[in-house]
Amino acid sequence: MLRLTLFGASLLACVCGFAAQPNAEYDAKFVKMEVPKTVVADQVFSVKITMKNTGTATWKEARDILPSSLRAVSPENNKTWGTDFIIQGQGTMVAPGKEFTYVANLRAPSEPGKHVFQWRLHATPGLFGETTPKTEVTVTKREGPAEPKVVIPAAKDGKRALTFDDFEYAGSFKIPETAGKGGAGFSEFGMTLRNTKDGKRLFLNYTHPEGTLCEVSIPELAKFEKGNVTGLKSAEVKKVWGTLINKDKKASANGGMVWDESKKLMYWSYYHGYWTGGDLPVLNATKLNDDGTMTATGSWTVPQQKWHWGGVMRLPKSFADKYTGGASLALGYGGYFSIVAPCSRGPALSAIADPDPTAGRVTKVVNLLGYPEGTAAPRPGDFFNANCTFWNDQPKSRTTGMWSYCDHCRAGVFIDLADAQGYIAFAKLGTGRLGYDYGTITNAGESQYWYFYDTRQLGEVAKNSRKSSSVLPYQVKQDTDMGGMVTAAVFDDEERKLYVLRMSAYAAGREFHPLVHVYNIKK
């Protein structure tokens, strides 16, 4: 064993191995390994492990079952170092007789002490070849504060800043399994409220297998506890409208939406899952006619389109009159979309005036919240980046990190009541090992969070007295018990009720279906 120093770090270079069977199809010889001798608890660090292909089969890249990847051993498939595998990488092949160096970031455990570090190759038949030497790495105690301090903004003008504890869970209900040609299983729903002579309804937009807008009743609520949906009632379909599609039939609704009763207009949004081209029709409007038909009314491109792909909402009149010159439509919600440079690295929101149906572009947006390139929203540090080159800042601790390429925001609500205020962005954050593996973004796990922002600070951004990236959430709260990703939320200011739709919230046969959870704001 030879002690080396690389980039100022103390490393162990191991050049020994164990005997392997000759002439096997899959076989490998250990060559060398570079791993820090000592790391701090929770530290993210880089390793290099070189193996030689001594078998007869070429090691090809792995996409489905991870052949020719390194797997943790002692014991097998342990996740002491944040993950149990290190991939070979996209576009790589290792012919017989050739060496290959596996490079990855790993994460130290939280517990101080000596921990075993050992790996072995894995292919279609299973583990094969020599293991790396059984090395002990010392993990030292991390010094510093355990959690960031939460400071709730002071009340002003009789309005307190809302926190997670202000929301009292009232109950939940199911979404209809089908409506027209829409199915609940894979749909990324949009949702908004409508007042009718028969009471309140929800508009829901299914996106799979075909887009379908419908109106549903709001049933009696029951509690969703420990994943049990037995007592939950299902909303009843009252009317099926059909597919929301823009005038040139090049975009259909797949984001958020908001209903304008006075104009009988549904404003809805569109985003593209993988887009490198020019402007797309982010905002669209469809008139719902009294005879049950729909008329495509307007379609608009907008500046900073990837900041605004998530959805559309209506701002409270009190806020719009004070800060945005009366502009009361808002587009958002930010976070990751493919090709990230133009995206907001965190929640985003901008105000616009109701657009002219004859115009094809919104020319003026009033930014309220967003994180341009070079800035980022905060997030918990319960993750690490294994191999990606964008939005890849490693966390400083288990509690402190920066928005990553596995973090999404598809819904938000703006609340301005007589006694309380706040903007809430609903974010899905990747956890554990995050990777860009064979052209696919992956994460070991995910958690849903509520981000609470002071609307007065958003107003300061609108007035150009504050940069949007300087607005930070005063509370980031994990919502652990409700399952699934939030794709829609709407606030009923008359009844002080918040409706939150989470897709894939419970198992329904071979599919996962959504639930709507309802919360009352405490007085």
Protein language model annotation of sequence segments:
Residues 21-39:
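Low-complexity, acidic Ser/Thr/Pro/Gly-rich terminal tails and inter-domain linkers that flank the onset
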Residues 56-79, 121-122:
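Short acidic, flexible loop segments centered on an aromatic residue
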Residues 27-30, 73-89:
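Short beta-strand and strand-turn-strand segments in soluble, beta-rich domains
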Residues 125-133:
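Beta-sandwich strand segments
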Residues 148-523:
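Sequence/structural signature of beta-propeller domains
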